[in-house]
């Protein structure tokens, strides 16, 4: 087995260079998921776990955005500036531009659209985009945009493309759920994602941790024994430890920048520093990266 840090650290010499224009797409994985494309909206089928996880993800995103908004409000109030409004409305993503990389059949993309975001779903599999587009078109409550580059709140557009092909565009929120473990050159892919985020924007990631338990659960049990997931869907060698992910983003300067903020907290009118960030946000890089 490779050393635990090999998968990301082997790309460490590339840190500081411009994002590569070459695609990180793994053709074998794209072919695999293209064969499964028609299963995306079968909630008892191949992707049942993703449908269940989607509800948790949406709630997680809401909680994180609320925490960041609360911190920003405290900073603004301490400096006598207009404070941003809290995220209390049901459509808490209203007005946000969101890019969902590796959107598959559109499970998260549709949910975010209903919450008010201007969503662009991107997948390297044209078959996945076909399924996502057809499913969205069947729902009259979803506003499907003709042009992905247009900004229309509570709307949805799909593109059959790689993340690298979007160079030059930026979004308030970028998501990549269960994608990192399916790409070539994960470090270049993550740098690409970082370049697609607007200043002050947010990146949400979800991936498999490379542990014995994850192998047992996602490959031995789900693929080999129960066959609820098609064999070959996952490769344990491509899973990434959370600390590897955090170390990678630290190498980009994200976490040290956060520490600078914590070291110079603004003062309240009575002269006391505002409350420190919640411990989870200190670890996850406030308002930027969530693993």
Which residue stretches match the model-derived regions?
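N-terminal, positively charged/glycine-rich alpha-helical extensions of SAM-dependent methyltransferases
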Residues: 13-58
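A short acidic, Gly/Pro-enriched loop at the edge of an enzyme's catalytic core
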Residues: 164-174
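A short SAM/SAH-binding and catalytic strip from SAM-dependent methyltransferases
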Residues: 173-184
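A short glycine-rich, Lys/Arg-flanked "PGG" loop and its adjoining helix->strand segment in the class I
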Residues: 188-199
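Conserved class I S-adenosyl-L-methionine
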Residues: 202-227
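Short alpha-helix
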Residues: 237-262, 269-271
């Amino acid at each position: 087995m490779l050393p635990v840090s090999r998968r990301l650290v082997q790309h460490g010499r590339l840190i500081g260079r411009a994002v590569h224009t070459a695609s990180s797409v793994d053709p074998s994985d794209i072919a695999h998921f293209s064969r499964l494309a028609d299963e995306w909206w079968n909630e008892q089928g191949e992707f049942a776990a993703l449908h269940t996880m989607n509800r948790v993800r949406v709630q997680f995103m809401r909680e994180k955005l609320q925490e960041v908004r609360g911190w920003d409000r405290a900073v603004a109030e301490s400096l006598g500036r207009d404070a941003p409004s809290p995220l209390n409305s049901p459509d808490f993503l209203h007005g946000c531009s969101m890019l969902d990389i590796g959107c598959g059949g559109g499970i998260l993309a549709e949910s975010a659209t209903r919450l008010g975001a201007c969503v662009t779903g991107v997948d390297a599999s044209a078959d996945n985009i076909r399924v996502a587009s057809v499913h969205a078109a069947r729902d009259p409550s979803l506003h499907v945009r003709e042009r992905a580059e247009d900004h229309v709140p509570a709307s949805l557009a799909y593109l059959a493309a790689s993340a690298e092909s979007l160079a030059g565009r930026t979004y308030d929120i970028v998501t990549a759920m269960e994608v990192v473990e399916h790409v070539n050159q994960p470090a270049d892919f993550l740098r690409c994602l970082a370049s697609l985020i607007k200043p002050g924007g947010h990146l949400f990631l979800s991936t498999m941790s490379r542990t014995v338990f994850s192998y047992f659960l996602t490959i031995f049990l789900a693929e080999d024994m129960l066959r609820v997931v098609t064999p070959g869907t996952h490769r344990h060698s491509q899973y990434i430890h959370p600390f590897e992910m955090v170390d990678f983003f630290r190498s980009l300067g994200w976490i040290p920048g956060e520490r600078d903020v914590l070291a110079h907290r603004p003062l309240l009118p009575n002269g006391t520093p505002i409350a420190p960030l919640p411990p989870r946000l200190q670890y996850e890089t406030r308002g930027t990266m969530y693993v």
